[in-house]
Amino acid sequence: MNVPVPPPPDGVLTGPSDSLEAGEPTPGLSDRSPDEGLIEDLALEDRAVEHLVGGLLSHYLPDLQRSKRALQELTQNQVVLLDTLEQEISKFKECHSMLDINALFTEAKHYHAKLVTIRKEMLLLHEKTSKLKKRALKLQQQRQKEELEREQQREREFEREKQLTAKPAKRT
C-alpha cells in the first residue's frame, strides 16, 4: 500500500545525497532575497512608531488639553470683557449727548400715550365682547326654549290627532 507524501518545502532534500543528509536545506536554494525582511522590518518599525506616538501623546496630551481649556476660558472671558466695554462705551456716548436724551424722553412719552390709548381700547373691546357673549347666550337660550315649545306643541298635536282617529268600538 502506497500513501502519497506531500511535496517537500523548497530547498529541502528528501532523498539521499552524497554530501547532504535527508531534511537539510540545499545550499543556494533557500537563500533569502535582500528585500524579503523589509516588510517585517517595516511592520516592526510601524509598531515602534505607534508605541512612541502613544507614549508622546499620553505624556503631553493632558497638559495640552488643560492648556486648550485654559485658552478657551480666557477667550470667553475676553469676549465678555469686550462686550461689557462696548456697552459701557455706548452708555457714555448716550450720556454725553443731551439731545439724544431729550429725544428719548419725548419718544418715551409718545409711546406711553400710545400704550394708554391701546389699553383703553382693549378694555372697551373686552366690555363689548362680554356684552355680546351675554346677548348670544340669551339668544341661544331663547332659541332652545322656542324649540322646546315647538317640540311640545308637535307632541300635543300628535296626541290630539291620535285621540281623534277612529277607534273600533268594543263589542259587548
Swiss-Prot record:
Region (Disordered): 1-35, 136-172
Subcellular location: Cytoplasm; Membrane
Biased composition (Basic and acidic residues): 143-164
Positions with biased composition (Pro residues): 1-10
A Pfam family recorded for this sequence: Snapin_Pallidin
GO CC list: axon cytoplasm; BLOC-1 complex; cell-cell contact zone; contractile ring; cytoplasm; endosome; filamentous actin; focal adhesion
GO biological process terms held by the UniProt record: actin filament bundle assembly; adenosine metabolic process; amino acid metabolic process; anterograde axonal transport; anterograde synaptic vesicle transport; ATP metabolic process; blood coagulation; bradykinin biosynthetic process
Keyword Cytoplasm listed: yes
Assembly description: Homodimer. Octamer composed of one copy each BLOC1S1, BLOC1S2, BLOC1S3, BLOC1S4, BLOC1S5, BLOC1S6, DTNBP1/BLOC1S7 and SNAPIN/BLOC1S8. The BLOC-1 complex associates with the AP-3 protein complex and membrane protein cargos. Interacts with BLOC1S4, BLOC1S5, DTNBP1/BLOC1S7, F-actin, SNAP25 isoform 1 and isoform 2, SNAP47 and STX12. Component of the biogenesis of lysosome-related organelles complex 1 (BLOC-1) composed of BLOC1S1, BLOC1S2, BLOC1S3, BLOC1S4, BLOC1S5, BLOC1S6, DTNBP1/BLOC1S7 and SNAPIN/BLOC1S8.
Family per similarity comment: Belongs to the BLOC1S6 family.
Protein role: Component of the BLOC-1 complex, a complex that is required for normal biogenesis of lysosome-related organelles (LRO), such as platelet dense granules and melanosomes. In concert with the AP-3 complex, the BLOC-1 complex is required to target membrane protein cargos into vesicles assembled at cell bodies for delivery into neurites and nerve terminals. The BLOC-1 complex, in association with SNARE proteins, is also proposed to be involved in neurite extension. May play a role in intracellular vesicle trafficking, particularly in the vesicle-docking and fusion process.
Record's protein name: Biogenesis of lysosome-related organelles complex 1 subunit 6
Organism of this sequence: Rattus norvegicus
